[in-house]
Amino acid sequence: MNRRLVILVADSAGCGALPDAAAYGDAGSDTLGNTSRAVGGLSLPVLGAMGLGHVTAIQGVPPDPAPTAFHGRMAERSEGKDTTTGHWEMMGVVLRQGLRTFPGGFPPEIVEAFVRETGAPGVLGNTVASGTVIIQELGEEHQRTGKPIVYTSADSVFQVAAHTDTVPLETLYAWCRTARRILDPWRVARVIARPFVGTPGKYARTYDRKDFSMPPPATTVLERLVEAGVPVVGVGKIPDIFDRRGITEEIHTAGNADGLARTAALLDRVDRGLVFVNLVDFDMLYGHRNDPAGYARALEELDRALPAILDRLGPGDLLALTADHGCDPTTPSTDHSREHVPLLVHAPGRGGGDLGTRTTFADLGATVAEYFGVRSDVGTSFLAEVTR
C-alpha cells in the first residue's frame, strides 16, 4: 500500500541550459556540470549510483551502467527561472505570463506606499543587487538611519534587509506582510525578509529569512492532497512558497544539514503522506555568491546525508530528488539560470531506469497526484515507470 513520498529540492541545482536559455542571458549554464569542472571533480558516490551522471556530464560522476534509481531531467514550461515559478510548476501550476521583474528598481508609487503604510523612515537601495553585497555597502547607513535596505534581482522579488539590532525581527516581518499586500496587484512573486547581524564590513545574513509569497493562481496538487485527507509536511521554505496553502505541518530549518536531518527524523514518525523539502543553501550561500567550491561541498554533504533518508524508506515509498532552476556559480551572473533540472526517483526494490527528458516540471506533480489518488490537470505521471 502506498505510504510516503519524499521530494527533496536541491534549490538551484540545474543540469544544463534549456533551449531558450539565451533569451534569459543563460546560454551555456550548467550548474552541476560546470561546478564539477570548476573544482576538478565531485565525489558523489550515492548520487552517482542513483544515476546522476546520466543527466549531464559531471566530472567525477560517470554514468552508472546499473543505476539504483530512475533518472531523467525536466524542462520548465513556464516563463521564468525563479523559485516560485519552479515550485508551482512542480505542483501543477504552469504560468503562461511571467511574474513581474524590476530591473530598474521599484517605481515611486510602490516605494512611497511601503514607507507610508509601514511607518519606516524611508528606504535605502531600491536597486538590483546581490544581497550579500548590498548589506556590506549600506548596512552601516541602515543602522544609523533605521531605513531598511530594499532591493531586487533578476527574479520577481521585493527584498527587505534589516539588522536585527536596528529593526526587530517581528517588525521586519510586519513590514514585509504590508509589502506583500501592496505588491499583489503588481504580480511580484515574493517579498523576502532578509535579517542580518554583525558589524560594519562583517555583516552576515541569518536563517530567519522569511518569504511572503503571492498565492498560486490555480489549485495546486498540494491543495488537492489536503482536501483528500493526505498529510503534507513542508520543510524549509516550502510553506512560504505556496503561501501555506496545501500544507498540514511546517518544519523550519537552519540550512541544508538541518533540513536533511529533520527529513530523516520525520520518516521515523510520519507513516503516510507527502514530505516536501527545500534545501536552500545551494542557492543562497553558493550559487548567488558564485562560489563553486562551496557549492561542491554542499553537494557532497547532500550525498553523505542521503543514506540516512534512503534507509528509512520501505516498500511502496518513493523519493524524488530534483531542483527548481539553476544558479550556475561559474558564470559572471549572480542570478538564477534557465536550466533543465535533474530528476532522480528512488523506489525501494524497483531498481532503476531512464525517465528521459520531461517536457514540464508538472510531471512530478502528476506523479504525486496519481500516487495518492487525487486529480491533476497538468503534466504526465511517470508513476507506472517507477513502480512496475
Swiss-Prot record:
GO terms for biological process: 2-deoxyribose 1-phosphate catabolic process; 5-phosphoribose 1-diphosphate biosynthetic process; metabolic compound salvage; nucleotide metabolic process. GO terms for cellular component: cytosol. It is found in: Cytoplasm. It comes from the Bacteria. It is an enzyme of class 5 (isomerase). Its cofactor is Mn(2+). Pfam families: Metalloenzyme. Mn(2+) 2 binds at D283, H288, H336. Binds 2 manganese ions. CDD domains: PPM. Its EC number is 5.4.2.7. Keywords: Cytoplasm, Isomerase, Manganese, Metal-binding. It catalyses: 2-deoxy-alpha-D-ribose 1-phosphate = 2-deoxy-D-ribose 5-phosphate; alpha-D-ribose 1-phosphate = D-ribose 5-phosphate. Pathway: Carbohydrate degradation; 2-deoxy-D-ribose 1-phosphate degradation; D-glyceraldehyde 3-phosphate and acetaldehyde from 2-deoxy-alpha-D-ribose 1-phosphate: step 1/2. Its main location: cytoplasm. Mn(2+) 1 binds at D11, D324, H325. One of its GO terms (molecular function) is phosphopentomutase activity. InterPro entries: Alkaline_phosphatase_core_sf, DeoB, Metalloenzyme, Phosphopentomutase_DeoB_cap_sf. Isomerase that catalyzes the conversion of deoxy-ribose 1-phosphate (dRib-1-P) and ribose 1-phosphate (Rib-1-P) to deoxy-ribose 5-phosphate (dRib-5-P) and ribose 5-phosphate (Rib-5-P), respectively. PANTHER family: PHOSPHOPENTOMUTASE (PTHR21110:SF0). Belongs to the phosphopentomutase family. This is Phosphopentomutase. It comes from Anaeromyxobacter dehalogenans (strain 2CP-1 / ATCC BAA-258). The lineage of its organism: Bacteria, Pseudomonadati, Myxococcota, Myxococcia, Myxococcales. The gene is deoB.
